[in-house]
Amino acid sequence: MTERAPIEVRGLRVGDSHRRRVNIGDRPLRVCLLSYRTNPHCGGQGVYIKNLSQALKGLGHHVEVVSGPPGLELDAGIPVIKPPCLDLYNPQDLFRVPSLRELANPINLVEWLSVCTMGFPEPFTFGLRALLVLRRKFGKYDVVHDNQCLSYGLLGIKRFVPTVATIHHPITIDRDTALREAGTLRRRAQIMRWYSFIGMQKRVSRRLDRIITVSKKAQEDITREFGISEDRLVVAPNGVDTDLFRPIPGIERDKTRIMVTNSSDIPLKGLSYLLRAIKKVSCKREVKLVVIGAPKHNGRVQRLVQELGIQEFVTFTGRVTSDELVTHYARSLMAVVPSLYEGFGLPAVEAMACGVAVVSTTGGALPEVVGDAGVLVPAGDSAALALALSQLLSYPERAMELGRRGYKRVLRHFTWEQAAIKTVQAYQEAIRAYR
């Protein structure tokens, strides 16, 4: 058989001789985590990377993180590499105009042009930057773990080191939900342009060594939407930081207070259905809805609150710290997760960890996560949601019991140590399968 000639990739000679055979045994693994967006206080990506990296380190593994904006500050012993980038989605300088010197960089130029034409290039460009950063460091790692970037750059990384990725849920679901809510052809075109990176993610994910996902429901949906066979998918449910999210003794629950941690205009999050449910409940009884965050100015949520005439019943907190969020949980009778779909449902688990009753929809993996520790209603059904809220407001002792049950469920099933152990199993499978 004729030996295959090596391939030149940005100065790297890539061939079979570069594929290291790793004998992992029981020794600690050397792991590199990648995430294109990493706010550790809000947004699932930063929370996932922060907690998983620390849990892996706690198991004795060696971890480095390549982080997109705004970046992470992790515990000592977990180095964080921050590739230079344009950071065009920085809320302090949103969609700034880069300098000519910055645009002389081809990756920066592609990113800027895509943003100017209403695309979302961050996953693509971050993957290329990660490849450039890591190209002289591949020998340091046993495995590279991407967090739903799924960029073509990963295929370059995969030539040198076993590579896995976490897909929290298929983004096609977000796109299709947004399209159903779109009112005009122009808006539909904008949505399709924004989600144009999905084709890349499908192609890349099919070529990686293993895919990690966070629930059985997400596993089924990824198989259907991305065409990945189930035997290449490993389910490793997310955890929750139980040192932070915990019951707080001594704080009395307000038996009229309901909270939700999402203020987004994104249709998938289902906040509009909760607002309509609050309208129904407020006609018959005293109720307060506390929404963590702030609505987009003149956005869907803000307009709907005004249209329904429920301003006196709804309070938006603005940005809160993690400790303030836990205090909000402690003061509330119940927390609501009104999402039309969740690949996992971190807000539900955080609420359960704080000992607060959860009212959740059946969207996506939420029934799998909440189990019998909460009240489940059909997704997108404001009448059913209003009935569930009214019942717990009428019987607060039932809400207290659900809160205790949820807390026990979290400790049994949803710690970050458990998540890290299952993630390491996926790493080991990927390393053994690497050819």
Q: For each predicted feature, which ranges?
A:
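Acceptor-binding helix/loop patch of EC 2.4 sugar-transfer enzymes
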Residues: 93-118, 158-202
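Carbohydrate-associated surface elements
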Residues: 217, 239
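Conserved donor-binding/catalytic core segment of Leloir-type glycosyltransferases
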Residues: 251-278, 290
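Nucleotide-activated donor-binding/catalytic signature segment of Leloir-type glycosyltransferases, i.e.
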Residues: 300-323
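Short alpha-helical donor nucleotide-sugar binding micro-motif in glycosyltransferases
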Residues: 319-320, 327-332
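Aromatic "clamp/platform" in nucleotide-sugar-dependent glycosyltransferases that forms part
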Residues: 340
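Short hydrophobic beta-strand element within catalytic cores of glycosyltransferases
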Residues: 357-360
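Conserved acidic donor-binding segment of nucleotide-sugar-dependent glycosyltransferases
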Residues: 375-382, 391-396
